[in-house]
């Protein structure tokens, strides 16, 4: 599975000096390749899905192709995931020659290649020196996170076991954060864990809200395989982004321009928009009162767990008071028209004519989890 979207892929390797055949019993696909294949065949792979790499010290053919049976991508390949094979280092095909094959150490004012033994010895000596001189907590680790195609810190099992399991290092930063903390700490404080929805939600939604994300380009398979069917089922789309991206155009093509609302907010005003929407929706009474009553404090005061886990908001009314922002204030801060904010609120929460609640699926990223707004 590739990246956080989780698209399925099949990986095949076989020796460079071994060939299959066109008959069904002589190839991995089990298909008669001597016959014309249909346009949507899953037995074809693009040049970007092929390479020659080293495996167990030997050259092998490598094919990484989309899994047509995976419910996430249904055989679709994005511009990133469909190039996993091409993005492997290969001395035979010449791909990714800039990838390191040995450690680098900063010596004499420049990065220089060194042996694994030298690199491991250096790390061990520096780490031991810090511990002997002071304390384990004086050791700071800076790293990039995530696994994905090229491997990541979480995949370097030995390193993780050393620093987190054995030494229990407390001080760590990763590629997009000053600490190894949550990207969505505020929503967790409100009882909403991230990644808590199914992709099927997009196909069932009355409204799809996209905040600081450009899914056609950045979550291609999720957009094409799940969001587009939702639009074809009648979903309206709200896009919160200072820019007009290709996603906005694609949504207008699929859902109709009249069913797409692009809120081109001023950069860094995401929370002001959400507070305004919250204030307006709550003021209209478009809330699930039973859910709110069962999920919030009713008169009691929230207590902090510790310094790292501050107290959550108390009652729903307290949240309304703390986050209150009028349409006029929100429009002035975000640069949006009041009418567009009202339209967004209606698309998100206004009950249908029969009184049933609207189903809104919200995907958010830049400006909220990767911003300091």
Protein language model features and the residues they cover:
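N-terminal export/assembly segments and adjacent metallocofactor-ligating motifs
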Residues: 1-284
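Conserved short loop/turn motifs at secondary-structure junctions
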Residues: 140-151, 329-336, 364-372
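A glycine-rich, hydrophobic/aromatic-adjacent loop/helix-cap motif
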Residues: 142, 344, 348-373
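Long, well-ordered, tryptophan-enriched scaffold segments
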Residues: 122, 238, 245-355
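Acidic/polar loop patches that form or flank catalytic/metal-binding clefts of enzymes
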Residues: 20-22, 171-172, 286-290, 340-342, ...
